[in-house]
Amino acid sequence: MPNRTPKQQPAPHAAKDAKDVERMRLEHDLITDSGIVPATKGRHAIYCLTVIGTIEGHSLAPDNQKSTKYEHVIPQLVDIEEDPAIEGLLVILNTVGGDVEAGLALAELISGVSKPSATLVLGGGHSIGLPLAVSARKSFIVPTATMTVHPVRHSGMVLGVPQTLRYFEQMQERIVSFVAGHSGISAKRFTQLMHNTGELVMDMGTVLGGEQAVEEGLIDAIGNLGDALRYLYAEIDAGKTGY
């Protein structure tokens, strides 16, 4: 019988290198396609979630607008809570607002994550972005960011009946209650900022800079990426040591 040369198996290190390359490619695609960083390569595994542009809910945003789709974010938050390898959550926001119910739904889920969490407002955290900004255990904002506080808006057909006005009031009450319950600002003060008529042209509301947002108690601290990560690392370390 002819001699058959046994098929050579790839060296273990070569297989490992191939897996590392594939993992890096998948991570790069995830960052490029959706702006998600599953876990950092630092001292602890921090999941970075971005909320940018318009928060898209039951209706699609126009094609020329960047958006964050809530049906994409919800499974990620479930995975963050379920995956034991993920130790913390960092939510980075630069949003103009969007669908009220979708924004509140995401804010409720973020507030329900049992792992250390932090939010960082860059650029803007406007409208329904406010509940998202205060939904984590600790909130940070850069000095140059702004936050717009205003009443609930609605586009499309509106029925001119008392029930419609009551619906808007109830939605606004839920927003005020959530923000006041997850930050240092009172419901009364938040409502005053929301109904301010002396700042915006032909509109109602208040624009807060980074330092103003902290002074009002809406955001916990002025800070940037390093500050948010240091907070998360400290919380994770404290949890592991039991302090």
Q: Which positions does each model-derived feature cover?
A:
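N-terminal organellar transit peptides
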Residues: 1-130, 135-150, 154-243
